[in-house]
């Protein structure tokens, strides 16, 4: 037993390390592969066009608005090629040699040292036994975007950019710094890394005071400013290049078309206009003279108003809806020469190759006196056709595909964060969040329609032109790919579940359940998508991605009809082409039908105007006939009065019969006063009996009394009737008659004028 213990102690002593020996150096453990690295493992050699480079961009303090827009512009193939080719393309060998020192690889031991230092600080700050734990100290989540960004800065290659405007032959500007960034990414020897756009931001802040502060900026404003600045810088560079003549070899190599990308790069200074510029036509039609006037204006992006529970199609329809110009907003018509009511509408006359749609999420409210974010649900399709075009538009049936989405995360316009989801050339959809770049599935793009406050919302949509053949080819590839298994780790990679700053943007791509399938079935009727076999927004609801239930044994007998499947692919292609042709025919028929309806409406209006003019002419003729009849009746009455009373035409008129009545009364009174005159030589004829005063004062009827009867061959003695004696005798009797009959309705002036008006109206109506 003693010998055994001695030998045991001896073995233990020999196995113990010597006290003075140094500890063994810790070997650096290999980092686990990121999802992006796993995706790029099977790629071949590096391409020379930069389409297989996936670089994040370092955030220098609220510069996410800049990073998201720059990423969208870089992955636009025609825009990237145009920037690289103007004024001339730098050879790839020169780029690689110049960027050999600019690309800085990280030391893997530095990360271990940083982690060891962090662990030591954590151990020093840890509470001692018996002390309560610090509630503010939380364990770091390795799945959060912040941790992934920090890890990327410590491990991925860093790419510095410098000013190379002298080699381009143009002055330093925002365009030259943008070209520096694009050339740095294209010429780098690493597919992944982080680029530092520090020089670009310095030029931006030097030339634009609005971006000098570290405040939250608007991504759409930056896009608009960048495109306009690029246009100005390119025109200045072209003017400088014209002043300094170049050799013929340099001029011939100024634009090198890229055969790998297949994009047609413009070789003029208007390549920005040819890519992003469209033409809007404002049609205004005067409602008075029906003359239409047009005014054209260019645009680099379209800003559309939003409505709750709508789509991009409905927003564009509202954008081109008819607007009534009335009241204070009347239209000045040159044809009418004044302000008139009019109808105004906006239509697209020329479509751009790259369509940037700005969803107006920020609206000024009068109550709050500030901008407020709208969390309206707006559905956007993967493929889009614009319908609000003019009849003479160039290529009105152009098909667009969604290739980039800029997302705003936050509750208001004055704070938040911007990220971009971009469809790459052959690697699918990627999420660019400053330094972090991760692959996402196609359905992840649908998470930013925006229907709840606090969630991420799509802010700028980038559509690029495509063809129906390319869409069909892409769908065939998607149908042949095996279904991807979605597990918890995939959800962590695609979402923002544990981020402190992006926690409100939790929009991980999940496998939809059958309830989700029922909820999204209404989107199948979106009119903006092309007539394809499967709507792009519902690919996850197919049997490929949904877990299908276990089939019954009975349906297994239906398996033999499967062999004819390889013969079916050509059939849908023919039917789709025929559908496209039939759709074009339907569009043409619709245009012809609308033109026919418009012509019919115009003809109907002319007929209505003709009928109105005829009726007005008939009314004028009737009025003239009534006036002529009134004149004839007036002349007849004048002749009758003249024949009965012997009055002259001077007294004839509207009041002639009343004047003759007073004259007859005065004549009667004068004749009664001459009753003592001896009889005339012809004794056979005597004057008729003169009515008494009572009969004159109270007549039995309102009709005037009959004239005195006398022979027509025996005229009155005018000298005797006109003598002063006769006037003296007749005046008191006439005054007495007026005094006695002033209360009589038939003799009052008011009633006489009323009977006159009534008589005139009867004549006109007859």
Swiss-Prot record:
Where are stretches of biased composition, namely Basic and acidic residues?
576-643, 734-747
Give me the stretches of Pro residues compositional bias. Answer: 548-572
Q: Coiled-coil ranges per the record? A: 573-620
Active-site positions on this chain: 64 (nucleophile), 417 (proton acceptor)
- Please write the reaction equations for the catalytic activity of this protein: Thiol-dependent hydrolysis of ester, thioester, amide, peptide and isopeptide bonds formed by the C-terminal Gly of ubiquitin (a 76-residue protein attached to proteins as an intracellular targeting signal)
Q: Which Gene3D superfamilies match?
A: Cysteine proteinases
All residue ranges annotated as the USP domain in the record: 55-466
Keywords of this protein's UniProt record, alphabetized?
Answer: Coiled coil, Hydrolase, Protease, Thiol protease, Ubl conjugation pathway
A single BP term in Gene Ontology: regulation of protein stability
Give the UniProt entry's GO cellular component terms: cytosol; nucleus
The Enzyme Commission number assigned here is: 3.4.19.12
Question: Biased-composition ranges for Low complexity?
Answer: 13-23, 249-263
| Molecular-function GO term, any one | cysteine-type deubiquitinase activity
Q: Name the domain of life.
A: Eukaryota
* Pfam families, sorted: UCH (PF00443)
* Subunit and partners: Interacts with creA, creC and qutD.
**Task of the protein:** Ubiquitin thioesterase component of the regulatory network controlling carbon source utilization through ubiquitination and deubiquitination involving creA, creB, creC, creD and acrB. Deubiquitinates the creA catabolic repressor and the quinate permease qutD. Also plays a role in response to carbon starvation and the control of extracellular proteases activity.
Q: What is this protein called?
A: Ubiquitin carboxyl-terminal hydrolase creB
Supply the source organism for this entry. Answer: Emericella nidulans (strain FGSC A4 / ATCC 38163 / CBS 112.46 / NRRL 194 / M139) (Aspergillus nidulans)
Q: Which gene encodes it?
A: creB
